[in-house]
């Protein structure tokens, strides 16, 4: 009995000490009518400093120059808790070595909790407000 209790205590300690992504939220982007082949997801997790780590991965996202009308760059936005859009960076589309598959990824840290993530195609990556169509969006977290 003593041996079983020792083993259970050890297992409980390991479960507590092993870092996991259990606290991370993963939300897929909704299907896009503008770039229908694009698929991706956003993972958001709170770090030990109470900041939010935001990771975005997208497959089959066409280059913004191939859109109609063409644009220069994709911009990633988040909707904050006060329902305001915030530009959090640009996304570069590239092909992997020895592959024709277009991939895009993005990672940032925010002190503000994101409620929703969306992507627009813009002519300038530093825009603070968008007038253009949303290319991809998530549901609320």
Predicted regions and their residues:
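Bacterial N-terminal signal peptides that target proteins for export
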Residues: 1-10
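Charge-rich, low-complexity N-terminal segments
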Residues: 2-3, 18-25
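Bacterial N-terminal signal peptides
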Residues: 9-19
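N-terminal targeting/export leaders
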Residues: 23-141
């Amino acid at each position: 009995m003593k041996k079983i209790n020792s083993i259970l205590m050890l297992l409980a300690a390991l479960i507590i000490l092993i870092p996991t992504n259990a606290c991370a939220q993963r939300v897929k982007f909704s299907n896009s009518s503008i770039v229908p082949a694009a698929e991706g997801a956003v993972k958001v997790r709170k770090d030990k400093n109470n900041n939010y780590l935001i990771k975005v991965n997208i497959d089959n996202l066409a280059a913004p120059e191939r859109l109609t009308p063409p644009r220069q760059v994709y911009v990633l936005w988040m909707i904050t808790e006060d329902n305001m859009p915030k530009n959090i960076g640009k996304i570069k589309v590239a092909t992997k070595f020895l592959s024709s598959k277009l991939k895009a990824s993005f990672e940032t840290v925010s002190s503000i909790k994101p409620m929703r993530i969306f992507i627009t195609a813009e002519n300038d990556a530093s825009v603070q407000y968008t007038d253009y169509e949303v290319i991809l969006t998530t549901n609320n977290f």
